[in-house]
Regions:
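Structural motif corresponding to alpha-helix initiation and N-cap regions
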Residues: 6, 51-52
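Short beta-strand segments
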Residues: 16-50, 66-67
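Beta-strand-connecting loop/turn residues
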Residues: 41-43, 62, 141
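Helix-adjacent hinge/juxtasegments
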Residues: 54-89
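Short, basic/aromatic recognition patches
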Residues: 1-20
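Charged, gly/pro-rich active-site loop segments
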Residues: 78-150
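Short, structured patches in soluble enzyme cores that scaffold and shape functional sites
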Residues: 25, 68-70, 139-142
Length: 150
């Protein structure tokens, strides 16, 4: 196993839209899958959610981790990990970031999966599940990555 370079870590983040978000709730770590978009211009991870356990936890403790992997086989994979700070967005900034998220994910799906998606509900059901979406970003403080290949 070897460490990934910064540019390789950013490539893993740029080329994917599904990852895992880790946060603390009542002293215990929780890890859940998320749909995300890596914004290299702002060095942030953008996502959204609705009211509930996850958002309550991140509002109380804003230290989070996002992990993303590309797995070809048990002996051939790359993993990127981002440590950062949760920040809830509102108003025009939230709208702009949600637009960036939607367009960014659509672009990745077009490139990687060779299919067209027109609406957010084609790759994420959260928007229509419970109320108004809560847009947030993870300000990246530290990154790390590993690679295994044979």
């Amino acid at each position: 196993m070897t460490d990934l370079t910064t540019s390789a870590i950013e490539r893993v983040l740029r080329n994917n839209y599904l990852g895992h978000l880790a946060y603390l709730w009542q002293g215990k770590p929780h890890v859940i899958p998320i749909t995300y978009y890596f914004d290299p211009a702002d060095n942030t991870i953008i996502s959204y959610t609705s009211e509930g356990h996850k958002i309550d936890a991140m509002r109380k403790n804003n230290s989070v981790t996002v992990q993303v992997e590309e797995i070809q086989s048990m002996f051939n994979w790359e993993s990127a990990m981002v440590h950062g700070t949760f920040e809830e967005l509102e108003g025009d900034i939230a709208k702009q970031k949600l637009h960036s998220f939607i367009e960014g994910v659509k672009s990745i799906i077009r490139r990687k999966e060779r299919r067209e998606v027109e609406f957010i509900n084609e790759f994420s059901s959260k928007l229509y599940s419970r109320g108004i979406p809560i847009v947030y970003q993870v300000k990246i403080l530290e990154i790390a990555g590993k690679r295994r290949e044979t």
